[in-house]
Curated annotation (Swiss-Prot):
Residues 1-49, 126-171 are annotated as: Disordered. Residues 17-39 have a biased composition (Basic and acidic residues). This is Uncharacterized protein C1orf202. The gene is C1orf202. It comes from Homo sapiens (Human).
Amino acid sequence: MAAPRFGGPRRGGAQHELLEKAARLERGPPPRGDPEAVGRRAVAGDGGSCSGCWCWRRLFRGPRRKKLRQAHARAGKEAPERGLWGPSSLQRLLQRLATWRRRYLRRKERPDRLEEIPLLVLDRAQGGHEAAAGPQSSVPGRPAQAAPARQPRRRSATRSRSPVAPPVHAQDCFFLFGQQKQ
């Protein structure tokens, strides 16, 4: 008689039941009173799947496996795709900032009026938008003193807009960093 299942009987129940019994017999060590146990060495396992089988111990605890684990851990620290900036979250942030800057440049806004983010100088250094970037400043956060690359188009008097905001510098952002002691 088949043992009652938790989820009800399975389709093709007798066949599955036999397969499960066979798998259970092969997987664990034979019971102590079993005549098969006499020929085999009984080893205390850790309770995992196939823990009594020598091949599983060899696969998961052997020196080769240990060496692979160490190499894998080392590769995490020295992963070349991370580049200079460390974790991938920081890379995503930098990418987002670069995209933000490119959008402003695409709108033909004057680059020297754009607030400068020092890490985005990297984008210019790699030659991403040399023509649109304009003159380079020696001090990050400050626009260069040379003439601007393009002048913005003049709007009609009927559609006047507020003047462009001045550049924002890190030392002015008290709400982000808290007041700095001087």
